[in-house]
Swiss-Prot record:
One BP annotation, GO: positive regulation of metabolic process
Chain intervals with Basic and acidic residues compositional bias: 646-663
Region (Disordered): 629-679
A GO cellular component annotation in the UniProt record: nucleus
Descriptive protein name: C6 transcription factor asaR
GO molecular function: DNA binding; DNA-binding transcription factor activity, RNA polymerase II-specific; zinc ion binding
Subcellular location(s) of the protein: Nucleus
Keyword vocabulary terms for this entry: DNA-binding, Metal-binding, Nucleus, Transcription, Transcription regulation, Zinc
Taxonomy of the source species: Eukaryota, Fungi, Dikarya, Ascomycota, Pezizomycotina
Lipid metabolism in keyword set: no
Pathway per the UniProt entry: Secondary metabolite biosynthesis
Organism whose genome encodes this protein: Aspergillus flavus (strain ATCC 200026 / FGSC A1120 / IAM 13836 / NRRL 3357 / JCM 12722 / SRRC 167)
Induction field: Expressed during the earliest stages of maize kernel infection.
Length: 702
């Protein structure tokens, strides 16, 4: 109790309770009050009655008596009784919670969606009504990555035109609470001019033009527009990275000199890819210069713009799209003295291209492309464009690694980015709030999705353990995938239309290769001679089908506009197997078919000067072809009774002829010797796996 004036006291607890809830304005009013401001009720009380002081809770006396309290200090009931009026002290934890903001509700819903996604993935796919045209576009065929407790703590920080993906737990929590720190963590730009000479992008740039280069290619706007149309016709249908309706205005604006560095990088990459798809004659007629010099000029411009735009320090969607079409590399040693990533395969399937694709993957991860855009509340359109770019990069990585016999464990297995929708570009726009459903017809994304679906399934099978019990499951995976692709995509293909025929042939070729891979694994598991022969025949048929469909892609005149890409997809693994089979079994029901496709592959590869350098693997294939031809000649000169049948009596003679031909090859001085000439008889087909695996351990100089 404190004395205010004569016979006027204020209960200390009540004042403290009011003070805890009082606003700054209330406290100011109290300071201005005098004793005259206090009103005494008719029943004079020794306690102060303050009319402005309204309590939120009933006093202790009224609460115990279960009567209504006026919640004034003192309350009317205590005044009538002459009792001391005490109010309970304020409990900070008893405050009414603040009103939940809309953004908080959105965050909670997003967190719930992520939790449900993780739960669904861990529990397996739910069984529901089947619809052949609807499929979960998440990477269900890839092995699920281990769930990290930090997965929910991630943020996409704006960084100028770029973004920065952060999933470190403590830092992401701070950034999520303090959005003002986004500017602090961004890439510093005020020191770019000072440090420009020390930036690491220079490592990626090859030598520019020759030292005596003085005639820079100057394109007219008509030539630029023609190159853009060539890109749309020859490149975009088979390399579906761009959303043409939104990119086209940027392309024409950049042609007129209005674009940023990122836009210029994309424009030069488009020029580069367009010229790559042209023949020597067509390039000279359009640009008035030979094709090689035009490509060197565009290469130099891309390298300069990539460094000026700091595409690795602050990658953007435009710059990554440009890099996905083209990546300069430090070594320029091949027929045409240059190569690049998507268009790289049109000149040389070099290991450096695969290595540089890893740089592109890291840049994509730095802006969170490996995480689906729904985690960051992006617009449906932005999330869909990111999916296209990410999966194009991943599929390229699979194919590039395969060129060099490298086991790809796959960045895709550590990603939850969904596959893009099966829609046309016209179905998407930045204004969309809800994405359309997949189309039950041919779309511009059909070829892209066909390739991606097969690549995902192949990675799943590739990483399963090799044992006999799994082979039936692998074959079932291939059969289910084939049925799904036929019912969803291939049934809408009209093979009279060039791009749809490309999709049909390339899909059939890849599925045959998938079957070849699965059957090939069974060669190591089968024990009996009959089982080995049966598996070898199935493997041979699949390899021939893959080669035949691949060669039709490269030789069909209707598909000439896409030959620049498919000429680089050399099915050397299948070719090596059929040559091995011809060495092991020079006779049989499929020999004529096998030799026809072998001769076609060698004629096209060796007699077309515009094709990329096949690399050192070609030396191995040439050696096996010579070996198979010698075996065929030996069989032709043998008596008919010795030319057929795998009986035990005839095997020693076959082995003797094989050894004789092997000795002749050893004397040629080609350096291969017994490495590529092991005992080749029907029972040695199981050694094919050992050869195909061990070839990567040796270095064959051209």
């Amino acid at each position: 109790m404190i004395l205010v004036s004569d016979n006027q006291f204020l209960h200390l607890g009540a004042l403290a309770a009011w003070h805890d809830r009082a606003t700054e304005h209330d406290l100011y009013d109290v300071q201005q009050l005098s004793v005259e401001n206090f009103r005494h009720p008719p029943e004079l009380s020794p306690f102060l009655y303050f009319t402005h002081m309204t309590m939120e809770r009933s006093c202790t006396q009224c609460h115990q008596r279960k009567v209504r309290c006026s919640k004034t200090l003192p309350c009317s009931a205590c005044v009538r009784l002459g009792a001391t009026c005490r109010f309970p002290t304020t409990d900070a934890n008893a405050h009414r919670p603040r009103r939940v903001q809309k953004i908080t509700i959105t965050d909670r819903i997003a967190q719930l969606e992520r939790s449900l996604t993780i739960l669904a993935n861990s529990a397996g796919p739910l069984q529901g009504p089947e619809n052949p045209n609807v499929r979960d576009t998440s990477t269900t065929l890839l092995p699920e990555p281990p769930q990290s407790p930090n997965r929910a703590q991630e943020v996409l920080v704006p960084d100028g035109a770029s973004t920065r993906y952060i999933n470190e737990t403590f830092l992401s929590q701070i950034l999520d609470k303090e959005r003002a720190l986004y500017k602090v963590i961004g890439t510093p730009r005020e020191t770019e001019e000072i440090t420009s000479g020390l930036r690491p992008e220079g490592l990626l740039a090859s030598s520019r033009r020759p030292t005596n280069w003085s005639n820079e290619l100057e394109l007219s706007r008509w030539q630029s527009a023609q190159l853009w149309q060539i890109y749309r016709n020859n490149v975009d249908p088979v390399v579906k990275i761009l959303h043409l309706p939104t990119v086209e205005p940027l392309v024409y604006a950049t042609m007129n000199g209005e674009g940023s560095d990122d836009c210029r990088a994309l424009l030069f990459a488009i020029y580069f890819a367009a010229v790559t798809s042209l023949s020597e004659v067509d390039a000279a007629n359009l640009l008035g210069r030979d094709r090689r010099s035009c490509l060197l000029d565009f290469q130099a411009r891309i390298e300069k713009v990539v460094i000026d735009a700091a595409c690795l320090d602050a990658p953007t969607m435009l710059s990554l799209q440009a890099l996905a079409i083209y990546i300069p590399v430090p070594s320029l040693r091949n027929r045409t003295d240059f190569y690049y990533e998507t268009c790289l395969r049109a000149h040389r399937t070099s290991r450096s291209g695969w290595i540089m694709n890893g740089v592109l993957i890291r840049a994509a991860q730095s802006i969170g492309l490996h995480r689906d855009g729904t985690h960051f509340h992006l617009t449906p359109f932005d999330a869909e464009v990111r999916r296209r770019l990410w999966w194009q990069i991943i599929v390229l990585d699979y194919r590039a690694a395969e060129d060099h016999g490298l086991a790809v464990h796959g960045f895709g297995s550590r990603s939850d980015t969904r596959l893009p929708l099966h829609v046309n570009d016209s179905d998407l726009s930045p204004e969309l709030r809800i994405l359309p459903g997949p189309r039950a017809k041919w779309t511009e994304m059909s070829l892209f999705l066909l390739t991606s679906e097969i690549a995902i399934a192949f990675q799943k099978v590739y990483h399963t353990t090799v044992d006999h019990t799994d082979n039936a499951q692998r074959l079932q995976t291939v059969q289910e995938l084939t049925a799904y692709l036929e019912s969803t995509y291939l049934c809408h293909c009209d093979t009279n239309i060039p791009i749809q025929k490309v999709a049909w042939l390339s899909t059939r070729s890849l599925l045959s290769k998938f079957e070849f891979f699965v059957y090939q694994l069974s060669l190591n598991n089968e024990q009996s001679q009959e089982a080995v022969s049966s598996a070898a025949e199935r493997t041979l048929i699949s390899a021939c089908a893959c080669l035949e469909q691949s060669m039709e892609l490269q030789t069909d005149d209707l598909l000439r506009g896409f030959r620049w890409l498919f000429a680089s997809y050399n099915q050397f693994h299948c070719l090596m197997y059929v040559l091995w089979h011809l060495c092991a079994q020079p006779t049989g029901p499929h020999v004529v078919r096998v030799w026809n496709i072998v001769d076609l592959v060698f004629n096209v590869t060796e007699n077309d000067p515009t094709r990329p350098d096949p690399g050192p693997t070609w030396k191995v294939l040439q050696h096996l072809r010579e070996k198979a031809a010698q075996r065929r000649g030996n069989v032709a000169m043998s008596p008919p009774t010795q030319a057929h049948g795998p009986s035990d009596e005839r095997v020693p003679e076959s082995r003797t002829a094989e050894q004789h031909s092997g000795q002749e090859l050893e004397g040629t001085g080609d350096g291969f010797g017994d490495l590529l000439a092991p005992p080749l008889d029907p029972s040695s087909l199981t050694e094919w796996i050992n050869l195909s695996e061990n070839l990567g351990m040796y270095r064959f100089e051209p």
